């Protein structure tokens, strides 16, 4: 697929904001979804590393040290480049340098998903994923780590902002409306 004719929807948001819900809606609309964290999980599998949150964070840092700060974006972009879909969604962009990698592949649109820290903390506690913070202090530290990657800059410069303080059903409807508008399906 020629880059000039490809739309790449880049999704950014803090942990617990609702990025995976937006990705699920995209999948249900037939939009291929690339989750940047999957690149790190694949590398862990390749190296025989148990995919615990601590190991994955350590491996992500190591990959960036070994191959540069955009290595995860570059590997994701490589997969997109061999995809013939005219619209794709990338879940988990964390820095403007990563955005620049995807801009080489086509037209990019950044969608930020935002929810207040208290809302996100409660969601994270309820979802109970392995490795999720269980205390407010752990949660705040994880936020600072994410912001240290430059995530706040991506969110601040987003083309669209979905505020997710709503019920799941209301957020899903908002997400579907936005994706329909972006993809011409609505």
Swiss-Prot record:
One of its GO terms (molecular function) is ATP binding. It comes from the Archaea. ATP binds at residues 13-20. Keywords: ATP-binding, Nucleotide-binding. The keyword Nucleotide-binding applies. Belongs to the UPF0200 family. This is UPF0200 protein Hbut_0338. It comes from Hyperthermus butylicus (strain DSM 5456 / JCM 9403 / PLM1-5).
